Every structure is written in structure tokens, then in C-alpha cells.
From Swiss-Prot:
Substrate binds at residues 264, 321-323. The keyword Transmembrane does not apply. This is Succinate--CoA ligase [ADP-forming] subunit beta. It comes from the Bacteria.
Amino acid sequence: MNLHEYQAKQLFAEFGLPVPEGFACDTAQEAFEAAGRISTAKKVVKCQVHAGGRGKAGGVELHDTKEGVKEFAQKWLGKNLVTYQTDANGQPVTKILVEEASNIANELYLGAVVDRATRKIVFMASTEGGVDIEKIAEETPELIHQSAIDPLVGPQAYQGRELAFKLGLVGDQIKQFVKIFMGLGQMFSQYDLALLEINPLVITGEGNLLCLDGKINIDSNAMYRQPKLREMHDPSQEDEREAHAAQWELNYVALDGNVGCMVNGAGLAMGTMDIVNLHGGKPANFLDVGGGATKERVAEAFKIILSDDNVKAVLVNIFGGIVRCDMIAEGIIGAVKEVGVTVPVVVRLEGTNADLGREVLANSDVDIIAAVSLTDAAQKVVAAAEAK
């Protein structure tokens, strides 16, 4: 689960990190009033969306007057912001962050991720702040400095000092950086984060450090024990189909093809998408129904897939392990009838009672195309999609 910038900064402040004074606003009038409460002559106004590249897309501006701030809010609230990280529709803007402008002398980068290979939290710091860190990692990896935190021990001050020295910080800046490092390390573990970034972490004209932007991603598997963070969830930033899938514990990712895919198991789902591509088709989605391919879950999966108008055919690829293929076949038939599927449906069953499952499909009164192999299924669904 992602957080907005203003939410990330709220957490930063909770752990004693320096952040600009700012207010998240729902209306243009609130933005106008917030601008009046900020002491600096210039105010920064930012659209709050779960995407980068806001500045280049016009979603971040600097204003001298309260009226300018209000006009910005009127322009964007209720609209969609399209950036290089969004699709063509963009992300809806429901909040505007109004905050004090900062006197920036230099920009740094500070971030942290979980390194699954070492089972540690790895902090990354660079003097190249304010730019795409992936580009820096590819072109000049020597400019990125790392420090690994053992989650059983927690962040240590000496690790923060080492990074501060590598960043060229001096004097009181080192103490400030260590405080930021320690706070982020504690936050990462306490809130079950998967990723955090401060980009940029700026050095102000007065020589102080300031968290100018913030990005936080929380491990969705840990949300059950993070009630505070659950309340920060903004469903408006999610694809409607993906949100629907999450309610049914279905793993769904929308793509831009015309062949809907319903599979049990992430690995099999990826293999299915590959073979559809191999035979000239384009998958419309990744959808893993998991181990419990019940009639109800299959029906919801069909609803999600068919809510995409680009879908011209659906491939159901199920491997029956614990769940028998004949039971899965009955569930598919019931789901097709319930949903009223109008596009061709190709079904490939393999595993426990696969022959019986195919017999159930063949004897049903619904129009389902049975496949005897994965290659056969891919060829049939691609042909069906092209014929529509």
C-alpha cells in the first residue's frame, strides 16, 4: 500500500524528522486559508497522487499569493494528473498539499528497501538527489552508498555517521543526518515498510537538513497489524478492478491486451501470459485466483476481467492439485452462467480428475471451448480474440 506525500511527512514528523510546514487541503478554500497560515512569502502547492513526475506534468507550482494557491487548487481538485508513471487516464487529485517554500542549497537522496537476499533493511544514500535514483544506479552506481541494518539489532548511530561522511556532510549536519537515519530505521520496522524514499533530502541555505519529499510503501501482508496505516488507504488511487480483486483476495494486474487470463498460481499465470504472447496474442491482465478456485471466486474473477472492454476472449488455465478439476469445472460453468459471459471462453484443465473435469465441461450447456494442452489453449484463445 502506498502513502501520499503529506501522509509520509506526517509519519516523518512523528519520528522527529524535519519537514516543511504544510497543510493537506480538500477544497480550494482550504488551500487559500492554508496559504495564509504559512509564514514564508512563497508557497509550494502539490497535487497529491500516487505517482512521480508531478512537477513536469504541472502538478507542482510555486506561488507568491493566496489567490494563486487557490487558483491552482481549483484547477486540479477533481481532475486527473497524467505523469510518466501513470496510464493515459492519470490519477485523480483529491487533495492538494500547501507548504512553505524552502531555500535549497543542495539536494541529496535517502531511501531504504528490504533486501531479501540478506534479510536486512538496506539504506541507500547519494549526493545525486532530486533525480531518478534508478538512472543513477544504472549510469553511476558508485555514487550510491549503502548501509545494511539487521532488523534484530536496529539502526546504529555509527552507520548513520558513515553515510553522512560519504555524503560530505559536516558539523551539525552529521548529527541531523544521524537523527534522520535512526528515525527512519525505527519507522521502517515499526510500520512494516517495504520501501521509503526522501528525494530530495535537501540542505537548506542555512545549512540544515530538510525532508522535502517523501514516498512510503507498506507491506500489504502486514496491514492486519497496522490499523493506523489502514486508515490512510486512498482507494481513489487504485485501479477499480484491482481494488475489486483485493476484496476477494485475487491477485490482479491490469494490462493493455485483449486476452483475459484467469489462472491459479502466480508462476502458472506468468507462464500463461508468456505462451499467449508467443502465439501472437496480448494478455489483458494477470489474474491469480489462488488455491481456492471456488464458484464465487471464479465468478468475481470473470466480472473483473470482463469489466475491461478490451477483452475479446478469456483463457482459464487451472491446475488441479488439492482442488479437483471436476469441481473446478462445475465452478466455471456456474460462474459463466451467473455472470452472463458473452466472449469466447477457452478452458484448459490439468491435474487431479482433469479428464473428468473436461467431461463435465463437454456435457454442459454453456459455450466453453475445451483445450487439451497449454499450447492448444493459447492458440485457440488467440484465434477467438482475433475473430471477435
